[in-house]
Amino acid sequence: MFEKYPGKMEGLFRHNPYTAFPPAVPGLPPGLPPAVSFGSLQGAFQPKSTNPELPPRLGPVPSGLSQKGTQIPDHFRPPLRKPGKWCAMHVRVAYMILRHQEKMKGDSHKLDFRNDLLPCLPGPYGALPPGQELSHPASLFTATGAVHAAANPFTAAPGAHGPFLSPSTHIDPFGRPTSFASLAALSNGAFGGLGSPTFNSGAVFAQKESPGAPPAFASPPDPWGRLHRSPLTFPAWVRPPEAARTPGSDKERPVERREPSITKEEKDRDLPFSRPQLRVSPATPKARAGEEGPRPTKESVRVKEERKEEAAAAAAAAAAAAAAAAAAATGPQGLHLLFERPRPPPFLGPSPPDRCAGFLEPTWLAAPPRLARPPRFYEAGEELTGPGAVAAARLYGLEPAHPLLYSRLAPPPPPAAAPGTPHLLSKTPPGALLGAPPPLVPAPRPSSPPRGPGPARADR
């Protein structure tokens, strides 16, 4: 069957990464197939060797010999034949077939070859439970179902590795259990106890630090054991017992939460008293709508309020005294300096109280100012009486004669330059008058005398 593959595939099957082969079944030599009959499959995996004296070699080919044989013939030793194709994989497959045949003889009514082959696979994952345990779910969740792997003759022992896997330094020397013993440690039946936080100390999925765990059921420390150490459920939050609670613990929490809010309310109430309001007279403080009256909570606040009231009263008295002194110094003639022009309301609307406020003052009513005549921009002369005054008033109202409007009546304009300096435009030079050509005047053409009226023509 394997003859159709090329020779390069032989190195794949011949290479053996393991140094030694522990015996799979007690009593059999390591590295050799079991000396039993293979039935109809006997010739499938037997080596194809023509020399009966040369036993088939197992494992890697010696370094001194090549797989294809030596190219130089040697007459002193028999020629090397092509070695057999037995390797570790052949032995493993043949052994698995043998076990399956023996199992089918005892349990002929069950056909489950897949579950039988899985426990025998070598590797760090260990063995899986056979089909007998998986077919009975009651044995998985009860304490009676957690039997030792040695009870099954076709399952490897917990303390033994695969038949072709030797123990090394990086692999845990302790075996892995083949049954789901952790499910038997649950408090309730089936999956109802998955939420229980209590696990058996000897279970496979229990913690490493759990006391009383036997070595065979302890969690392995190798990195592959992380898959087995993970719990089946997430750890649930454990509510503290009633004894751990104190009767006053629940009542203290609302008080602690209320303290910041009370402090904030006090700060909001004290805020108007700590900062002065803008655009508000200190003598007449106004309270905001919905705000309580003055509530002095501390002695410092009271002292500040008293000082503010005293300062406001002193400022009002000083302002009144300054106004009276200014009115006495200026007198009734300078009262217009004290009264500022009232500002008009928005959009120049009517506001008689604001405009008449200055005239209703007591000082204005007591001594009103004297109305002064408007200033004159000309000197006052003697007033004329009689008919001459009317003519003078008429002439005074007329506009003076402008030289540009009346050029004939206007005197000649003065020279632009000084009188001592010669002016170029004052007179025409004589050379220009003598050298100028005479004006060209066309002579009139002689015209024929006009005709008199003659007889009318017939054709017209």
Curated annotation (Swiss-Prot):
Modification Asymmetric dimethylarginine, positions: R229, R239
Key word Ubl conjugation present: yes
InterPro entries associated with the record: AUTS2
Residue location of crosslink Glycyl lysine isopeptide (Lys-Gly) (interchain with G-Cter in SUMO2): K8
Biased composition (Basic and acidic residues): 248-272, 288-311
Protein name: Probable fibrosin-1
PTM sites of type Phosphoserine: S281
Source superkingdom: Eukaryota
Region (Disordered): 40-79, 205-311, 406-460
Record keywords, A-Z: Isopeptide bond, Methylation, Phosphoprotein, Ubl conjugation
Pfam family, one: Auts2
Keyword Phosphoprotein included in the entry's annotation: yes
Species this chain originates from: Homo sapiens (Human)
Annotated Pro residues bias: 212-223, 436-453
Positions in coiled-coil regions: none
